Amino acid sequence: MGLSLMLQGTASDVGKSVLVAGLCRIFVQDGYRCAPFKSQNMALNSGITINGEEMGRAQIFQAEAAGIEPDVRMNPVLLKPTSERKAQVVLMGKVACSMNAVEYHQYKPSLQQQICEVFHSLASEYDVIVLEGAGSPAEINLRDRDIVNMGMAEMVDAPVLLVADIDRGGVFAAIYGTLALLRPAEKARVKGVIINKFRGDISLLQPGIEQIEALTGVPVLGVMPWLDIDLEDEDGVALQTGKYDGATEKALDITVIRLPHIANFTDFNALAVQPDVRLRYVTQPSALQPSDLIILPGSKNTLGDLQWLRQNGLADALLTAHQAGVPVIGICGGYQMLGKRIIDGVESGIEQMDGLGLLDMETRFAHEKVTTRVNGNCLLALPGLLSECVEQPIRGYEIHMGSSLLGADATPFIDITERNGQSGGWCDGAVNREGSVMGSYIHGLFDSANFTRALLNALRQRKGLAAYQGEILDYTHYKQTQFDLLAKAMREHLDIERIYQCMKTHRQGSVP
């Protein structure tokens, strides 16, 4: 058995996912074969493995940090909320069922053996596994059936580091309270604390660190500053906290409508890092102005979010903006909303609903989920805005339930040449006759650097601006540089040698 280490948090969004990615990068740099693991992830941001299996985006970007191919064993249970009370349960990359919170809480014990087996299968292929918890281990109302925090650490006998976020205030109370609520054996498993997101003079923090170490008996292994490093977010917290407000004006203004059940908003990270793009997430009709491009993102509740668009006034505002010449792109659920009609029987109690009518297309939902990685190219002779994108290569993945049938006034967008490694010929998406409205089922569309730059230059041309002359930003390469910056910062601010000692000493102490 190799080494293992688990990061748990005093709360959600304390930075566990990013720190796990950083540790994976460090261990790989130090010559270890390393993989991430999170037994249960609740998120609407997901991706597809090379085998067509669905898993959380957080474990995908952690695998990227480790320089390895994402493997569904890294995230055996994925919960995707479909409403305020219900979630779709994805087991080992495939949809199993939908449950409410009470049903799932009763169901969890039956998953323990499978999760344990999956972990050991993964661990047998690597030198180090870095586990991530969820929320806080001090959720005492959920402890008896826990499979993701201390319950998981006990299953595989992993030492734990506790991550606390100082930016939100009350960091010492959060550390002390969390440790106080743990059982004695659980507290003994916590080998150190990481204080995250610090701003200011660390000397002012030192007296508090000394006191919390004395009070708890647990050492603080470092204080991570607030970093200007751009990495993917696990869930919608970043949207709620205004990370993507787009305060700085740029040559192009792109707005994404922040649907209540927005899914895979990481689709647009590649746009956010472009030097000439201001990306904004909006929830009010007035915020659509000024826009050079409006994007309708994916949704886990397409009909519910379409109703919300109409009730909120955003549907009318979008149609008005389009009539004034603003192009519109829809991705997955957003693509479906742009059509004439959606026929359901799967997602909600609504049998059918009229779409926004911007594309001559009808969508019919199905029970079977499509989960594929795809490669392809923009089709020849695309009209309007997309004329600059002809034959540009496209890579991405599909996650959807249903299919769309195009009418005479719509043309396909993308020629898919490969699905899950199998060659063939398929068409994806739709474009209207004028080339001002387009949609696709492909997530990660804007990660295709040449396509994205061609599209952005077409938008620049519409505004009378010259084409961007700088280097084309490759988002995949960009992420790799961010992982290296993260690892460098963690080496500077954390006691990495002591973290190694925690893992090795714990393993030695566990050997009979």
Swiss-Prot record:
Give every GATase cobBQ-type domain span: 251-451
By its UniProt entry, which InterPro entries does this protein fall under? Class_I_gatase-like, CobQ/CobB/MinD/ParA_Nub-bd_dom, CobQ_GATase1, CobQ_N, CobQ_synth, GATase_3, P-loop_NTPase
Catalytic residue list: 332, 443
State if Calcium is listed as a keyword. no
For the biological process aspect of GO, one term held by this record is: cobalamin biosynthetic process
Endoplasmic reticulum in keyword set? no
Q: Name the pathway it acts in.
A: Cofactor biosynthesis; adenosylcobalamin biosynthesis
Which keywords label this protein?
A: Cobalamin biosynthesis, Glutamine amidotransferase
Which GO terms label this protein's molecular function in UniProt? ABC-type vitamin B12 transporter activity; catalytic activity
The record's annotation in Pfam families points to: CbiA, GATase_3
Q: Which family does it belong to?
A: Belongs to the CobB/CobQ family. CobQ subfamily.
Purpose of the protein = Catalyzes amidations at positions B, D, E, and G on adenosylcobyrinic A,C-diamide. NH(2) groups are provided by glutamine, and one molecule of ATP is hydrogenolyzed for each amidation.
Under the heading NCBIfam families, the entry gives: cobQ, PRK00784.1
The protein depicted here goes by the name Cobyric acid synthase
Query: Taxonomic lineage of this organism?
Result: Bacteria, Pseudomonadati, Pseudomonadota, Gammaproteobacteria, Enterobacterales
